[in-house]
């Protein structure tokens, strides 16, 4: 699914459906540089971004924070010298929801 960045997140509740394995594979094709990890039994999308210095990494982190506020969906952002790691997952669903893939695709667009 290559148009994920054009979609808008929907309200996610505790009973929101997690993506199926088939949906996961399909949506991963649109965000090929992301990987699925499992932390504390919860699937998450993770990607590391590298930069030439801390200031560029910091600026990118701020763009992700603005994206998160606009979508009302919030990731874990780890800022280091020359590197930002972003993890998306749906806290209320305790796993991966379509919102996570939408935000991952929009995160990739923040590099442009």
Curated annotation (Swiss-Prot):
Its EC number is 4.2.1.96. GO terms for biological process: tetrahydrobiopterin biosynthetic process. Gene3D superfamilies: Transcriptional coactivator/pterin dehydratase (3.30.1360.20). The keyword Lyase applies. Keywords: Lyase. GO terms for molecular function: 4-alpha-hydroxytetrahydrobiopterin dehydratase activity. InterPro entries: PCD_sf (IPR036428), Pterin-4-alpha-carb_dehyd (IPR050376), Pterin_deHydtase (IPR001533). It catalyses: (4aS,6R)-4a-hydroxy-L-erythro-5,6,7,8-tetrahydrobiopterin = (6R)-L-erythro-6,7-dihydrobiopterin + H2O. Pfam families: Pterin_4a (PF01329). Transmembrane segments: none annotated. Belongs to the pterin-4-alpha-carbinolamine dehydratase family. This is Putative pterin-4-alpha-carbinolamine dehydratase.
């Amino acid at each position: 699914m290559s148009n994920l960045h054009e979609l808008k997140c929907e309200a996610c509740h505790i009973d929101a459906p997690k993506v199926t394995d088939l949906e996961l594979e399909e949506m991963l094709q649109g965000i090929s540089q992301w990987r699925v990890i499992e932390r504390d039994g919860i699937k998450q999308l993770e990607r590391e971004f590298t930069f030439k210095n801390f200031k560029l990494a910091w600026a990118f982190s701020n763009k992700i924070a603005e994206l998160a506020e606009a979508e009302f969906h919030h990731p874990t952002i780890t800022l280091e010298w020359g590197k930002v790691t972003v993890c998306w997952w749906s806290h209320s669903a305790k796993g991966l929801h379509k919102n996570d893939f939408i935000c991952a695709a929009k995160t990739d667009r923040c590099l442009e």
